[in-house]
Structures are given as C-alpha cells and as structure tokens.
Amino acid sequence: MTVYNAPIQETWFVLRHVVRIGELAHLPGYEALDEDSVKAILDSVGKFAANVLQPLNHSGDAEGCSRSIDGNVTTPAGFKPAYDQWVEAGWPTLEADPEYGGMGLPKVMATAVAEYVLSANQSFETYTGLTSAAVSAKRKAALSRASRSRSRAASCC
C-alpha cells in the first residue's frame, strides 16, 4: 500500500522563510494568522491526509461515484465519513469570511491544505475543490450585483 507523508516541515519552511508569513499579520486577510496556528493547521491536515484520505485513494479510483435512476449519488466507500470529519474540523472554511462562519485565513493557507489533500487523494480533493470554487463564484457574483445596485442607486439621484 502506498504511504503519504505530508511535507509539513518543507511547507512550514516555505511559509516562514520565503512567504514570511509571520511578517504579514498587519495586512488585510492575515490578521488571524499566527505561527502557532499555521503549524497546528499544517500538522492536523497533514495527519488527516495521511491517515484518513490516503487509505481511501484506491476506493476513489476503483469505485468512483454512481448515480441511480432516482438521482441519488453514492460516493466511494469511506468518502462520506471522511468528508464528515473534514467538515467537523472546519477545514472547508479556512479562507471563508468569518462573518459567514469561516476562519478568514489567507489563500496561502488554503493552498497549502489543498496541496496535502490533493497529494493524498485526488478523488477526494475534487469534492473539496469544487465546493471552494462554488463558494468563491457565488461570493464574487453577489459582490458584483451589490456593486451594480449601488452604482444604479447613485446614478439615479
């Protein structure tokens, strides 16, 4: 069986010495970030990727998803409990706005997390990646509509 070990020390090195994440706390979007939190997230997600996601890699490839005639979708064996753990840990909300229940962390943290998930189990990452993309698209569409509404209101008075 294949083993996955997340490159936690390497990721930490890049974030600390190349990105200089510790120096970014004064920037918008980085306020909630501190070195202890970064390390804890990398450690937790790395363990989850190695211990939960990587062992499911084969079922994701071999079984895939299936859709019944009545429209119900079945995911590969183990994916539902893994997804439940993923959500329970709060990782889908890393970069989401705290106003809507997110952690408000910068994209660089979500990218590091996605790298671990993708490396451990590409099939599983399609669920989490598509969800993040959908949330981002909805947010941008809502902001665009709000901006157009403000522009129209300002131009009519």
Residue ranges and their predicted role:
Residues 1-126:
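Amphipathic, small/basic residue-rich leader segments at the start of a protein or domain
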Residues 66, 131-134, 152-154:
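A glycine-rich phosphate-binding loop feature that marks nucleotide/adenosyl-phosphate handling sites
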Residues 126-146:
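N-terminal glycine-rich flavin-associated loop
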Residues 95, 103, 147-157:
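Glycine-rich, Trp-frequent "lid" loop and neighboring beta-strands that shape
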